[in-house]
Amino acid sequence: MMRTFVALEIPHGVKQQIRALQDHLKELPPLRQQPSLLRWTNTRNLHLTLRFLGDTDKAQRHQLQNGLAALAVRHAPFSLTQSRLGCFRSWSNLRVLWVGLEGELEALQDLQADVESLARQVGFSPERNRFSPHITLARTARNAARPVLRAASEHLRRVAEDDVSHSWNDWKVSELHFIRSVLGPGGAQYFNLVTCALPDDI
């Protein structure tokens, strides 16, 4: 069995911008006073997940590789850019901090819907949560003190509501990736299994 998922890679320049945003947020007073409050995503591991699959056997991987190649040719490249700060579950009960996406979202949604349909055909259960395009910046630490976390969440909410304009770079999505995730003591490591190009000549 391999732990796998389907995702879009994020360009190096965009990762640098997201790292700069993380560094800026870390300077907010509650986060500066208690840096361990949030577990920040390593920007080297950033990607836009279209469908997490989990344990995948050899036969399923073969079906997925063929299916992804077949569906990729039906989708043209499209552009995305980052948008405002957001969170799951809520600012009063913060679990995940993320930056949203804008741009050609309909093309992104169509691609994700095809990936979801393929996953079901291969035998995976339907995804319970509606697809919400985002890039995860941080997760709440398991031992986070609630009063301090509430204070940090309030600062983050203000940043999100101020919606300070960033000079985000647009990025072109031209490939779909089938990725293996290997969990270890230093966190997850990712290995690309298959890359499927989105053709320009549709």
Regions found by a protein language model. Name each.
Residues M1-I202:
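Histidine-dependent nucleotide/RNA phosphoesterase domain, centered on the 2H-phosphoesterase fold
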